[in-house]
């Protein structure tokens, strides 16, 4: 009976379904993170060896087919997220977690710097039990570094991922708002400018 209820829920609201997409190639896995504005987070992951593809979008919300304007209204519950396709033989998931923690302040609720709103929350959205376990272990280890501050990162199963509008994709690599392209070359460690 319980199974019937959950399937009818997912039929009426696809946003609540798990992310059932498949990576583009065999042997690749998905990872999904939220760490504030997705532009800089995406560029950081683009530079990682073993990351084959990145895309920014909206996840963990309750509205089907959201857009940027809607999620900024604060009514959809979505996070600005990045979905990564990676080769775990080249780049272990634990490496992605390390970069995730280094890219933002996981102790600020629903904000990163001047960006404020639930869409800027911190989250790790896992695709399998191994990712869930590694995410929890990494949070426990990271919490020891923040002795007097509580980490507010949510760790949840990945819900349906809605790809953001095309102008958001690889935004900083394409030049951002100021037309200053930033390198997405593997291994690049140039500072990331948030708006281009």
From Swiss-Prot:
Q: Which UniProt keywords apply?
A: Oxidoreductase
Q: Which PANTHER family match?
A: MITOCHONDRIAL PEPTIDE METHIONINE SULFOXIDE REDUCTASE, PEPTIDE-METHIONINE (S)-S-OXIDE REDUCTASE
Q: Where is this region: Disordered?
A: 1-23
Return the broad EC class: oxidoreductase
What is any one GO biological process for this UniProt entry? cellular response to oxidative stress
- Tell me the name of the encoding gene: E4
Q: What is this protein called?
A: Peptide methionine sulfoxide reductase
Q: What does this protein do?
A: Has an important function as a repair enzyme for proteins that have been inactivated by oxidation. Catalyzes the reversible oxidation-reduction of methionine sulfoxide in proteins to methionine.
The record, for InterPro entries, names:
Met_Sox_Rdtase_MsrA_dom, Met_Sox_Rdtase_MsrA_sf, MsrA_MetSO_reductase
Family under the similarity heading: Belongs to the MsrA Met sulfoxide reductase family.
**SUPFAM superfamilies attached here?**
Peptide methionine sulfoxide reductase
Keyword Oxidoreductase attributed: yes
The protein's matches in NCBIfam families, at most eight in alphabetical order, are given as: msrA
């Amino acid at each position: 009976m319980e199974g019937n209820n959950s399937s009818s829920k997912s039929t009426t609201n696809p946003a609540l379904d798990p992310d059932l997409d498949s990576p583009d190639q065999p042997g690749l896995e998905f990872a999904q993170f939220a760490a504030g504005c997705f532009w800089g987070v995406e560029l950081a992951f683009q530079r990682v060896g073993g990351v084959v593809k990145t895309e920014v979008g909206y996840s963990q919300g309750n509205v089907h087919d959201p857009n940027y304007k809607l999620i900024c209204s604060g009514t959809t519950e979505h996070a600005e997220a990045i979905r990564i396709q990676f080769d775990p033989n080249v780049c272990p998931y634990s490496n992605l977690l390390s970069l995730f923690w280094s890219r933002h302040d996981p102790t600020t609720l629903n904000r990163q710097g001047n960006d404020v709103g639930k869409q800027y929350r911190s989250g790790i959205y896992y695709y399998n039990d191994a990712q869930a376990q590694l995410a929890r272990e990494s949070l426990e280890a990271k919490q020891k570094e923040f002795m007097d501050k509580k980490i507010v990162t949510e760790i949840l199963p990945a819900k349906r991922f809605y790809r953001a509008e095309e102008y958001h994709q690889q935004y900083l690599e394409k030049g951002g708002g100021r037309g200053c392209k930033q390198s997405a070359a593997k291994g690049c460690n140039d500072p990331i400018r948030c708006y281009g």
